[in-house]
A protein has these predicted regions:
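A short, structural motif
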Residues: 2-3, 14, 21, 28, ...
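One face of beta-strands
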Residues: 8-14
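Short, intrinsically disordered, charge-balanced linker/junction segments flanking boundaries
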Residues: 305-312
Length: 312
């Protein structure tokens, strides 16, 4: 089962700069290798900024509607002013900020809402608060764009804002990437179908530390999930558990695992030896094994070796 799951996709080996290019290259390679077995995949990797433009278009009328009460007088203007004042107090009490700190975040929430994001200023507040709490690596000057991106992804993929920001925060913390890079990966991943079981953001938050520890990059993590998704895996947990189990088994180095590596190519055996000497990562071994399994003519043997090293 495991060999069948991965054999179409070969080794990981991503070297492109952006998430769009990475997943687009994989899409092209999969279409060519599958030789018509799959329908043409939807082009992945639309920048989050482009996705966000769609939401801003929807919000254009709201922006126009907001400008009048802000500039006008009477009850509507008083209501808006009161909402903004309440917004700042909510932010301050939720985050324990100084009055000045809450004022600065209140301005961000106000501008975000005026740009057409959220059904109310309260919704924007909660989104900004989650970005601030879960994405601690985001610089202050990027909080507005990060909030807009998080809200856009939440709406687009019908996901909770807390899960969106937790996932993005874990990508930033573990892989050292920017908020834009994290959101671009989610936009590309979502368009590749990674949220089919409605767990993409939560799974990334859970497994990002494991992938980092194993030596994978953020792009490689999403590529592995995309490969498994295209092959019809039940859910992302199944895919990520395979990677987790693989790491455990190669670290353990049981006789069954060692015997399996003895049946693989000299190149993969060398990678395995280097890993055991502390000169490589689980990711190096993972890539080498997938390369071997994909090239084997004897698919029964490939499946047996895959089960031996992956545990399934």
């Amino acid at each position: 089962m495991l060999a069948e799951m991965f054999q179409l996709f070969g080794t990981i080996g991503i070297k492109a700069d952006g998430a769009y290019k990475d997943l687009k290259q994989f899409e092209d390679r999969v279409q060519k290798t599958a030789n018509g077995m799959h329908d043409k995949f939807q082009k992945a990797g639309e920048s989050i900024s482009h996705v966000g433009n769609k939401m801003k278009d929807v919000g254009t009328n709201m922006t126009a509607g907001v400008s009048l009460p802000l500039a006008g007088i009477g009850a509507a203007a008083v209501k808006v002013a009161s909402d903004f004042d309440t917004s700042q107090r909510n932010i301050q009490s939720s985050l324990g900020l100084t009055e000045k700190g809450a004022e600065n975040l209140g301005k961000i929430a106000k501008e975000t809402w005026k740009d057409g994001f959220g059904q109310s200023i309260e919704e924007v507040d909660q989104s900004l608060i989650k970005v601030y709490q879960n994405m601690k690596e985001v610089p202050h000057e990027e909080l507005e764009e990060a909030t807009k991106s998080a809200m856009t992804l939440g709406k687009t993929f019908d996901s909770d804002i807390n899960e969106v920001t937790r996932g993005a925060g874990q990508l930033m913390t573990n892989f050292g990437i920017s908020s834009k890079e994290a959101f671009d990966l989610f936009a590309a991943g979502g368009q590749e179908g990674l949220n089919y079981s409605n767990e993409m953001f939560d799974n990334v938050a859970e497994y990002a530390p494991l992938y980092k520890q194993a030596g994978f990059s953020a792009n490689e993590m999403f590529t592995i999930m995309a490969n498994g998704t295209r092959d019809g895996s039940y859910n992302l947990d199944y895919i990520n558990d395979l990677v987790k189990e693989f790491g455990i088994r190669v670290q353990d180095g049981s006789k069954g695992v060692s015997d399996a590596f003895a049946e693989m190519s000299p190149q993969t055996q060398k990678v395995w030896d280097n890993f055991n000497k502390g000169k490589g990562t689980s990711a190096d071994v993972f890539n080498a094994v997938l390369g071997d399994l994909g090239k084997m003519d004897d698919k029964v043997k490939a499946n047996q070796l895959g089960v031996a090293v992956f545990g399934r």
